[in-house]
Amino acid sequence: MNPKNLILIGGGGHCKSVIDVAESAGYNILGVLDMPEEVGKSVLDYKVIGTDDDIPQYVDKAEFITTVGFIKNPAIRVRIYNKVKEAGGSLATIVAATAHVSRYATLGEGTVVMHQAVVNAGAQVGANCIINTFCNIEHDAVIGDQCHISTGTMVNGDCKVGERVFIGSQSVLANGITVGEDIIVGAGSFVRKSISDKGIYSGNPAILKVKSK
């Protein structure tokens, strides 16, 4: 298998952004897997060549990356990640040519770091995460698996973010706080103190608006 061959899973808007990142990182994109009704169509310059049921036939030909977005719920991204793993496939870890990831930081498999993002020394980012455009993951911060840190967000030093968390665009996490699992933080929020109850938070300071059942 050529380690630079890549199959994208999910053909929406996030897929277009990941295509640009993958091209900048030197990947050879073989095609996109999407819904049955999309087969034969194109996403930018790349054909939709099948559905996620076709993952097993590409395991020996390419790595995979999940290109379904995550705003309200990570369930589809988690399902795709697990489907690749169950098929014996490998998930690529992709860093845009314009991003900076410290050699003292770690990234989990299936994670993509988008253009102009920074992951600083000592930071740990889990599996199947989106570190979106212009994000800053500061020193010694920990991001759990299956998270989306959205555009322009600042995760300050020593923060800990649990699994399956979405942090909306241009939000700020104050130094050293903890965000629990299965939490959504609305765009433009300032999380000044640690939060743990599952639900939707927003505002400055960020407060719980909707508690998950």
Model-derived regions, located:
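Structural signal for interior beta-strand "rungs" in well-ordered beta-sheet cores
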Residues: 93-209
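Short amphipathic alpha-helical segments
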Residues: 19-21, 77-80, 125, 196-197, ...
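Short alpha-helical
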Residues: 13-14, 72-75, 106, 190
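Hydrophobic, well-ordered beta-alpha structural blocks that scaffold small-molecule cofactor pockets
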Residues: 1-43, 49-52, 56-57
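Cofactor-binding loop segments of dinucleotide-utilizing enzymes, especially the Rossmann-like FAD-
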Residues: 11, 34-35, 69, 96, ...
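Short helix-capping segments at alpha-helix termini
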Residues: 26, 85-89, 193
